[in-house]
Amino acid sequence: MLDLVSKRNWFYLFSFLLVIPGVISLMIPPRLRPGIEFTSGTTFSFHYAQDTTTSQVKQLLSDLGHPEARVQTTGPNQFLVQTSEIEGSATTPPVGPALPSGRDVVESALAREHGGFLDTQGNPTTQFTEFSSVSAAVSKQIGRNAAIAVLWASLAITLYITWSFRNVPNSLRYGVSAIVALLHDVLLVVGAFSILGKIFDVEVNTFFITGVLTVVGFSVHDSIVVFDRIRENVGRGLIRNFPEAVNHSLLQTMGRSFNTSLTLIFSILALLLLGGGSIRTLLLVLLIGVSTGTYSSVFIASMFLLTWQQGDIPRLWRRIRGLPPKPVPGVQLPAE
């Protein structure tokens, strides 16, 4: 039988090597490239009737007083623009007609170029396909709520797993081990986006937060499947040694985890290649998170649980503090 648990230090080393580049990137400003949801600003999209390049659009926006604008192509002659906040409503003076808003000025100026705009059905139009603005106050609130959501989700997961495995000795360790794997996955995703932001200008937006929360759920679900099989093998009393129980459980669930994840990854890849640009950030988070979540649920969560149960963590802590090693008796499973 394949012995996985004896190689757990190699799995830890592999995870460490995966995490380090992202951690280094996060230490170099800018850590992440935030979208307008977190920095305030305006985003709008439009479709030109004639062939147009991003450099031409950038020049038009620069002439309109927005040299900081970032332009992305979302399709043939289709563009997504992100710039500083543009007023979206007209100003009504005490006397006379309403003054044009910032949006009206930019929209009308761009619509006069390159054959004008086309709507989603391909008909001529004078309006943007999409337009949205986020103020500085709203962007701060979104960032704060996103951080709170991740923290509450982690706490709720720990409590739920601890309660679900309450009949198993040291049930809190199961919950903490799942959170360790979860943090491993989140750190890899955030680190990857930090690197992608520096190289390819990939931004972090609300779709990123949605994807991270989805990855959190997927990672914990996979870990629970492995933990549940460990609990079953422990309860049957057929395996007297805890490392053997963990190893046997991993071999039983590994095929199921890999097959489920591969099916999901193929679906994500299809959407990433054929889907729209608006959800590309979400799909990229899911692609990275599902891949790392499959690995961590098998090789991090269960291995960390075994390391803790075997007393390796207290021994390591004593070694760091310079204390003499304390003998820890072997962990034996209780008879049913």
Please identify what each model-predicted range represents:
Residues M1-E336:
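A structural signal for conserved, well-ordered secondary-structure elements
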